[in-house]
Amino acid sequence: MKLNRLVALVVALCLMLGCTAIAEQFPLVDEPTTLHIMAQVGSYYPDQKLDNVHGLQKYEEMSGVHIEWDNVSNSVFGDTLAARIADSGTKLPDIILRGKIGNDKLASWGEQGIIVDLRPYLEENAPNFWKLFNEEPTISGAIVGANGEIWGLPQVILGAEMRTPTKLWLNRNAMEAIGMDDPKTLDDYVKVMTAIRDSDWNGNGENDEITTIASANNMHNYFYGSFGLRTRGAHHDVVDVDPETGELRVYFQHENFRKYVEFMTMMYQEKLIYQEIFTEGDKQSDVFNQTNRLSMLLNTIAPGNGGDNWYTVNWSLEGPDGYAFHTQTRGAIHSTGNFVITCDCPEELIPVALKWVDYFYSEEGSALALIGVEGEDWEVKEDGTRSWTDTALATRTEDMSNDAFRAQFGMWPGGGVPACFFSNLLDAEYGPIPSACAQALLKDYAPKKIWPIITFTADESAVVSQLGSDINNFAKNFAAQVMTGEKELTDDTWAAFQDELAKMNPEKLIDAYESALTRVYGEGAEF
């Protein structure tokens, strides 16, 4: 009994101290203050407006800072922002939020005086971010410019759940119906998918089962690892390190890319992959799940209201040469350029703007920004885990996607959030099974080195952004043509593909990476 009283006293004291700390921190201003924010939003947000997000409404009350939101759809955000910057007669917003703006563009805008260097203001006005910046070395490599500038703040991810986004999700009913073990190799996977394709596991008497569904990018990024490709993680396509030689390479030039294309062609032509993957991707996954047709999914989380019917596995699929990399593994940075202050922000409001966003880099502020208001949208259960409240769950309709549901409460869906994603942010999303999966993938299947987002010089960036994109698009288009039967993969077509690739001068891309990686890791270091 005495112990229980002591625990209760400690908890009460902690809560009181926490409330005191928050009371001292807020409001952020002594008089009414307004910030104008241009934000990128997706269709899953209520009326496509961040104004309607409950966590942000609550934060306006707490901070005393009123936000005039300019919500711009993600389909036109880039063009809209570029047009406003190009029009010298248009006043820019104080802040550009969730833009996922690349370092090369940030550096260019910074040199032109369009955006503000945040570095001089951070230590005093953004202590939460400054602490992360000094504790996690990959952050500085990702956001610090050539002369020490910091033009924008990133989305930081510390939890394994967010660092290993693409996982293989299996439908429990489908697996029980075919009576087979979970696949551990590509050969196993083919056998399981074939059995599912022919099973009528949903029992409706129709051959309407969807085997594996994914976006085209998730498909590539997941299966590359089974062929020893893309061995330096999620932030860098096209260039990696050969796991056998340790040399930099453009991995589309390796023979294993041919093996990959051959395997995926067989999967597609045998209808073991969703046939509209190149046109619809995974957009219909929730619909197929609701109609009891979906068997497997490559995604961060289970589809729709998957519940206990979906589970994931703690390994990557082993390929023909023994590779089983989980190449869709991130460093501590999800994306850069998610909080940018423009030249039109009044100088006296720059500290206020940074204090406003800095709360999102604390554990309490992160939860508010991403999943909403504690006690109203989510709660801490007796076992210490976090879960949606009954009130929040009551808003969910059968046809509502995970993103649309979460977007009512916080800015999580769509990414590009200037915040820190801590581990087990919400156990309703990342319960024991997917959390264990993420930990296992990060520990046992991630490449031995994950390249962070890199700040390239202007010359390097010109090569990486243009040539890298051209090569990536060329290779993926070749794979799609072969998979769909538009082109047959023979020795001659493979040789022609390699000849065209060589004409694109991939050595320039490798040289740019070698120069940048030497700055990151040091002269003579292993990349």
What feature does the model see in each segment?
Residues K2-L3, V11, L15, C19-F527:
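Extracytoplasmic/secretory soluble proteins
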